[in-house]
Amino acid sequence: MKTYQNHAMTDAEARQALADACKQVETNLPLYTYQCQNHSSVNDIYPGCANNQWTCGFWPGEIWLAYEATGDEKFKTAALIQVDSFADRIARKVEVDHHDMGFLYSPTCVAAWKLVGSETGKNAAIAAADQLLTRYQPSGRFLQAWGTMDDPGNYRYIIDCMLNVPLLYWAAQVTGSDHYREIAAAHTATTLANSFRPDGSTYHTFFMNPDGTPKGGRTCQGYKDDSFWARGQAWGVYGSAIGYTYTHDEKFLDVFRKALEFYLSRLPEDMIPCWDMLFAPESGEPRDSSSAAIVACGLLEAAKYVDETEAAQWRTLARQMLASLAANYAVKPGTLGSGQLLHGTYSKKSPYNTCTPEGVDECVSWGDYFYMEALTRLTKDWELYW
């Protein structure tokens, strides 16, 4: 495994970085208590938006993390206002016909249930898990990402869903219904079998044939089909760590190690990847700070389950990544309307992909959230929202 000599964030530095992040959340409460943040910033400032994007759960997740860190009731009050909005969204089925129920409801409503016993949050999250079940394709044994369920052009799943299926594992725990767990297990088995290449890299999206056999991997937001989209690799790393948390199946740690090894092999010296890891840092291609924050969370989660030698290596890597983020990518606290991390990439167009260009070299809401989550993990024994 590739190692680095970079500075590793100390406990004191983690506490200060988290305090700065909480200050940034506090600064933004007047802007975004009654609305959501757009998926990405514009000139490093987030436009407000209605609760109708797949990314709307990350800002409330930041508020809950700030509440955990400070105990300040203003964060709890603001977070519960958001929970009510998410309960309304799932009740009215507003833009929920896709697979991103975990991204929406784990850091908002599951968090509310775990932290303050919110029945509204619990019930909304269970309803979101039920909605996610409607995306299941039994022939291919996967949760379809996008589009209508009878559209052959969308008969596929994506690596991001590794962070959506934990909602199903949680729902199985709180309801006692094994059906959620069975669907989660089926989808992750399909993902592990097809979405991770032999070298540990990942496909963004993977198409299946109508008879349930694999068809092939394609990109949407990576540079091209056979390149190495950084955020997809990060979802694979963290998702496999959480998969082990819920199942204690060693195959998840095996996949984690291989995906991590590939990720590390493609990092520049400051440990923050380009948006697609096909590119070297001297290429001038934009970085994606959010990928580093996601991987740091995965390292700290997986480190709970291995021997101390390996755990210490993984924790050091996470601390090095976070030190780099805090020193060179973090927003100065108190910057009204901005996020936590600069230099994220949502969706960069290439000659070979199908995405809409948005949020290039900007703050991205999930990067902000996972940066705070990783810092929180360094300051306490944190219970997953996922």
Model-inferred region functions:
Residues 1-386:
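Glycan-recognition and catalytic cores of secretory/periplasmic carbohydrate-active enzymes
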